Amino acid sequence: KNNDLPDLLSTTRLARLYPDEFEDLGQYVDTSIFEPQALQIISQNYLTDKLSVLPQQFTITNVFYNKDAFEAAGLECPTVDDRWTMDEVYEAAKKLQDSGAVKYGMAMDASRARYDNLMYMNGGSLVEKDGDSFKVVADSQQNVDTLQSFVDANNSGVMPKAIWAGGSSDNPGDYFKNGDVGIYFSGSWNYNPFVQDITSFKFGVMPSPVGSAGGSAILGGAGLAVPTNAKNKDLALEFLKWFYTDKN
């Protein structure tokens, strides 16, 4: 609003809030180097074909699991070719808990960055395109079914109930690191800390579950953008052309 943005910036949503204030970067780089889904999630202006942002990083949900607990409960990790549904995840979580190998079968960060993927797996969304605008569809049957399954699992005690019920500030990541949780939905950024911190058991990352509409692991992320009024716009665009090549 103050017209004082840098020539090149990393942003999650500025370019969508003010699309006319940023360059269309699709004309400067070869967008075929990106997965189409990545462009849609990070870069696409939903009302036009303009690419105001080029993907830089993603918000990805990993499904961590306690290998030792799986072995104790007689469970095998799903494969890429035979991924679990969320119903199967809930069932496995109950088996883990019932086996006594862990206190809680599963846990999930109290964040939309985790839950919304469950919604997308079943073809749900909070809004959908309606002509040149959007309409709210938060109460669609897909969303209701997804939420009910999650609430039922949470109420059953297979998860640390208070984390999503709002009665606790506990970090579910600590539960997993302590060996109290069998399956943990969290950010991919937790992988390196877990490698450093977890020494009492072996852990892994399982393939993302699928729903009736497929899988979903990427909720959003950030990308690089260039303001149309940037002082050194040409230099910023040259950098992006150099940066977004296979070599670099």
Please report, for each region that a protein language model flagged, where it lies by residue.
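Short glycine- and hydrophobic/aromatic-rich loop-to-beta-strand nucleating segment
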Residues: 62-65, 119, 224-226
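Short, solvent-exposed loop/beta-turn-alpha elements that line the ligand-binding surface or hinge
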Residues: 24-37, 79-82, 124-145, 196-197, ...
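Short helix-initiation/N-cap motifs at beta->coil->alpha
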Residues: 1, 83-88, 163-177
